[in-house]
Structures are given as C-alpha cells and as structure tokens.
C-alpha cells in the first residue's frame, strides 16, 4: 500500500493524505472529516509510512555510523553506549561496526556504512594511512568525526583524550626512588596514538635517565599484553615499573601476576584506562580514566553540525584525570 493509493481510497490529494498521516493536519487546517477519512483507510490497510525513504529524498537518513576497534574493550563499549543514547535522544539511529584493528575490515565496514547513506561517520581508526583513506571518503560526501584516535585536523573533526602529556604524567607517577628501570607495553606502534604515548613515556623517563624496555603486541588485547610481559619475565628482564598503553593490555599483565604472585612485590604498574576493580587489587595500579561523557557530547555536537552542513575541522582535547593508588 502506497501513499498514492491511500489518497485515492480516501478521496483526497496525496499532499493532504501526507499531512494527515504525518501529524500536520492542524497546521494546514485540514477538517476533522477529512482526517477521519484518511485515518480510516490507514487503519484498514495497516499502512506504515516509510520514514527512511522520506529521509533519503530529503538528503539525509537521520543515522550515524560508528567504527570502533574492539567491542570487548570496556572503554570503547562505554563510548559506543553513550553515543547511541545521545544520538537516539537527538532523533538519530547509530549503526555500529567493529574493525578488530584490521585495516581491511575497517575499510569494508566504512564502505558498508556509507552505502547506508549515513549522515556522519564516527571512527577510531586502526589504518596507518587513515587520513588519506578517510579524506577520499569524506570528499565523496560523508562527514568523518575521529574519536579517541586523531586524524589530520586540517581536514577532519577530532575528539580525543590527551595522549602525550597524559603518558608523561602517568609514567612519572611510578618513577619513585626505588625504580631503576621502566618498561612500556603497547600495541600497533605504527599508529599515531601509540607514538604519542611512547613519546610522553620517553620524555618522563629521560628526566630520570633510566634504562627502558619497549614491548609491542600486534593488537590492543589481553593476550598481547600477556605475551609481552611474560617474555620479559621468562628472560629475566622485568623492569621495576611498567606502563601499559591500554587497559586491555594491562589485563594480560595481571594474568601473569596472578600465576606468579611473587612478582607483585617487584614491579610498579600504571595504565591508560581504568576499572573500578583496580581499587580492590593487592597491587596498586595508577590509571588514566577517560571522560567518556565529554567525548560523546563533543563528538555528537560535531556530527549534528556536520549533518547540517556546518562541518568544523580541528582537534578537541579532552583532559584525562590521573588516579594514583597508594
């Protein structure tokens, strides 16, 4: 059943039928008699207007896309939930895809989302040449909002948490007088976010002139964190303090410590990210929680502006809050 058929059966114009069905009868002073005629046909044939088709004709779909690296990562899961809630409250749906930090999967997801005529795309990219790829996509008509991992701010809107300065402060928080060596457990060193965190780490350690050990996994996940840390332990190369560049990597470190609890007395830990469970561990772990609400609010504001043809380039830095556990 189409709108044309509804109008013919009700004996009114297509425009009049549309006004009645979409709740605009009072605005256009359509009589109650005409309203009843139209709605009687609507109810008889169980007609449902195709809002998606209407939105596409109007040039928008009232939907956003979101690509994140890992749905099991509590930080990204929290951010996805907030963006979905905020988008829904603004009258938008959000379509979510997971890249697993695989460039091919991410590009396929981006193309699939763009094919759905989304009004803007949020992405935490794991593509080494992400700015180049997403610039082509953006020039084809879909605004891109970078979250958590920045793109080239000359061309893109970016909302990220501070990385270089945060890594500096986090590292410095574990450099007590009894620390004589420091390690960094990270992943995907080719990503800009990884470089920023390593540089902040290096700057803090340089001030003390301490030897460092760097270990990088292939992904930001628990297993990779475990591999790096376990290798240090097996080779008798465990530093006095270790900084993890994500909470998921820290989980792998904690797995090793659970198996060898005597090591808890030999190492100080710090991590990007946070979890309430850290408050209950026998080992003290300093952490860097993100302000997810601020990130989600800022990202949505940028997306709404972009969908209204008011795209703004630049980086918005959301400060982190160092949590020192003593």
Swiss-Prot record:
DNA bind region: 3-22
Any one GO molecular-function label of the UniProt entry: DNA-binding transcription factor activity
GO biological process: regulation of DNA-templated transcription; response to fructose
Location of the HTH lacI-type domain: 1-58
UniProt keyword annotations, A-Z: Activator, DNA-binding, Repressor, Transcription, Transcription regulation
Recorded phenotype for the gene knockout or disruption: Does not affect growth on glucose. Mutant shows a severe growth defect on fructose. In the absence of the gene, expression of the fru genes increases in glucose medium.
PANTHER family for the chain: CATABOLITE REPRESSOR_ACTIVATOR, LACI-RELATED TRANSCRIPTIONAL REPRESSOR
Protein name from the UniProt record: Fructose operon regulatory protein
